[in-house]
Regions:
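Active-site acidic catalytic loop and adjacent metal/ATP-binding pocket
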Residues: 28-40, 166-211
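Active-site activation/catalytic loop segments of kinase-like enzymes and analogous catalytic loops
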Residues: 210-243, 259-282, 293-295
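A generic structural signal for beta-strand entry/edge sites
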Residues: 33, 83-86, 190, 195, ...
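ATP-binding pocket architecture of kinase catalytic cores
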Residues: 32-127
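A glycine-centered beta->alpha junction motif in the catalytic cores
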Residues: 81-99, 141-145, 263-283
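Glycine-rich, phosphate-binding/catalytic loops in enzymes
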Residues: 105-106, 197, 214-216
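An alpha-helical support segment within catalytic cores of ATP-dependent transferases
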Residues: 4-17, 118-182, 246-247, 293-303
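Conserved N-terminal boundary motif of the eukaryotic protein kinase catalytic domain
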Residues: 17-26
Length: 303
């Protein structure tokens, strides 16, 4: 992000809350978003977060989450400049420890207990079933740009998944169905001195809660249905919906969850490649990840 633009956004936010300009320290910066801790002359601190599309809906999601009683950082002010969103919010401080599986279970149970938010995008059964077709569309656009030309295996895998999607997607609206955080990882559960808070709602939507549960352990390792089953059982024991353990689409719940989560991730990676990032230099990094995830999808969804 252009430094002058981020400075202008921060100036706008400070004006809204009646504070002088603070000192800034980066916490983490990505290509389309960033997080900073800002310290005001009186010693008080806040978190300054900025993002552009498709991460520019987070303020809306945070407000909806707060209205429903979810533990999220308090939002003090928001501003828009040149299609960039700026937010000033509570500084929760340094976590006292990393979140573990039980923290993730507790967060998921609370998230899934609140009523769905009508202002969030919807990903129901039809939306899930459309993901492989959307990914094929992304592949076609990439090929028209003379990129991803040696990816016939990706096309074949997506075709198989698309053909089976109508059957495998069955059960998508079984409980838990509602809030989906979509970036649900241990780093999104902040465990502080005053309890835990959920962070990073930029891509929240309404859909199958199993997508979140399947995302918690990340995507860098080979997906483990056994580990996923244990996590689902912990979730139900902690008060989560019993149907989280129910078979869906002719598959065990854990295979369904992991398979559709990986398919959701594949479509997102390919959309980034052609639309949001759109940098051919990054294709050598994206293609192997997509191949690996598609191999997992084919195996997990048994297509």
């Amino acid at each position: 992000m252009d430094q002058s633009l981020s400075a202008t956004l921060l100036d706008d936010l400070c004006t809204l809350v009646g504070k002088p300009l603070p000192e800034r320290a980066e916490i983490r910066v990505w290509g389309m978003s960033g997080v900073e801790r800002v310290t005001f002359p009186d010693g008080s601190t806040a978190v300054f977060k900025y993002a552009k599309e498709p991460f520019d809906r987070e303020a809306q999601a945070l407000r909806l989450a707060h209205q429903r009683g979810l533990p999220v950082p308090a939002l003090h002010a928001t501003a828009l400049r040149d299609k960039w969103l700026g937010m000033l919010m509570d500084d929760l401080g340094t976590p006292v420890r990393d979140a573990d599986d039980l923290d993730g279970v507790a967060a998921a149970v609370m998230l899934h207990a609140v009523r769905p938010a009508c202002g969030l995008p919807l990903l129901d059964g039809a939306g899930l079933a459309a993901l492989p077709g959307r990914a094929l569309d992304h592949l076609q656009r990439l090929r028209k740009a003379e990129r991803w030309v040696d990816c016939n295996d990706i096309e074949t895998a997506l075709g198989k998944i698309s053909a089976a999607a109508g059957v495998r997607v069955q059960g998508a609206t079984l409980d838990p169905f509602g809030w989906v955080h979509s970036e649900f990882h241990p780093t999104s559960v902040h465990v502080g001195e005053n309890g835990w808070h959920l962070l990073d709602f930029a891509r929240a939507f309404t859909g199958p809660g199993l997508i979140d549960l399947a995302s918690y352990h990340g995507t860098t390792d080979v997906p483990s249905p056994f580990r996923m089953r244990v996590f689902l059982e912990q979730y139900v024991t902690a008060g989560g919906h019993e149907d989280a353990l129910a078979a869906r689409g002719g598959l065990a719940a854990e295979a369904w969850a992991l398979g559709w989560h990986r398919m959701w991730a594949v479509e997102w990676f390919m959309e980034q490649a052609i639309r949001w990032i759109d940098d051919p230099a990054k294709d050598p990094a994206y293609i192997p990840v997509v191949r690996r995830h598609l191999g997992d999808v084919v195996q997990l969804l048994e297509v």
